[in-house]
Amino acid sequence: MAPPRWHHDRRRMAIFVRVGLYTLLFLMGYVVPLIIFYNRSRADTFEDTPRSGEAFISDENFFHCIAERLSYKEQHPARIPYVLIPVTMDYQDIKQLFCNITVPMTYIMFINNGMFRPLRSLLDRLAVDLRDYVDQNLFIIHHPENIAYASAVNEGLRHALNFSVAKVPWVFITNADVRFAPGLIDEFVSQANEKTQGQLERIRRLDQEIIAEARTLRNVPNRRFAFRSSQHPIITASSLPYRIRTMPPEEMKKQFADTYGIFYTDHKDFMATFALSRLAIATVGFFDENYYPAYGEDHDYVWRMAALGYQKYFSEPGKFVHFENANLNVGGSARNRGIFKNTAYFLQSVKFGRMNYQPFRLQYRRAKWFPDGVTIYQDTGRNPLPFNGTIPLDMWVLDTDRRRSIWEIGENIRCHRDYKPYSMKLLDFPVDPS
């Protein structure tokens, strides 16, 4: 017997109700927030608030602090020769930083990574207010596409290398989310100046050795160890000779054991704020840009320095503060008052969070330093040389396809599962025997 008509009507009505509820949920949970975020992102809602316990610093006071730091003569004995600071969403932090450091600075380089419009506006207004310093002592570069931390530092280092060793004997590289106790930076500058004396002559001797290599090196077992490049995808240091590149790890560690290469404002190996000597940059090379978008490039650089035997300078404990993961936690206090109050921070931090997926970073780190290790802690199971010594210590080979895949994940163009791991085939590049 056919079911009653009212039974069919109830089933149809239930289907309509479910479809309607699903549609409503979709609109409320996806479309409406998108519209709100779109409208608010156009307005770029933003609150310029200091961290808890810190005094508010206005934009005008920040401009004054920068001008005061740059107003001293470059021969000032207590100066920081070159300040390199990559920034992304560090609006109030950069103001606190430059008003917290009171020593003279000869050159300041801001490299702005990302599309955080409030910060772009601040730096644009800084350039207008300090127009007499721009491209003389003050340099500002914008990368709305976000070239990542390692690439930003490398761009700043290349710029710093345009100055003589006498003018820039070391480069001061810092995050914005750091603070210093009175007297810390003064002592740091004094120690860095003292411990980098005499490096110019050593760089000169190494460069002469490399020039001679071009005439004397023939039929070497692995020509990659005689290869040099300053262009992507293969980057090498300028002044590490073949003789040192091919040494066994035990012998290599002795080469710079009498030399300070890195200086920390912290009392331990922590690269939130540090300085590199010109000799270290010339021999260790540039930061590995395969660590993308951030984190891991610092350990990699320290391990390469350790392989060459460089000494480290540490500051006294208790005088340095770092607010860790500031880019991931930025705007936390405002988020507590409602996420829609902080759209400018939120959209940028979400994109960074998608890109900064831990398995992406650990895959390359393991391949380079821990191919046989069960763990990938700093001092457990790490090989003494990158890629087990198959390429020179100072060399890295950029995998542009891998970087592109991570960027597309950040832009929500690609899913995490479609990530492209680092291609080890890139290390086996051909070298022209001529």
Curated annotation (Swiss-Prot):
Gene3D superfamilies: Spore Coat Polysaccharide Biosynthesis Protein SpsA, Chain A
Chief site of localization: endoplasmic reticulum
Keywords: Endoplasmic reticulum, Glycoprotein, Glycosyltransferase, Membrane, Signal-anchor, Transferase, Transmembrane, Transmembrane helix, Virulence
Record EC number: 2.4.1.-
Pathway per the UniProt entry: Glycolipid biosynthesis; glycosylphosphatidylinositol-anchor biosynthesis
Residue runs in coiled coils: none
Task of the protein: Glycosyltransferase that may be responsible for the addition of galactofuranosyl residues to the nascent lipophosphoglycan (LPG) chain. It could alternatively be involved in the synthesis of the galactofuranosyl donor.
Protein name: Galactofuranosyl glycosyltransferase
Organism: Leishmania donovani
Gene name linked to the record: LPG1
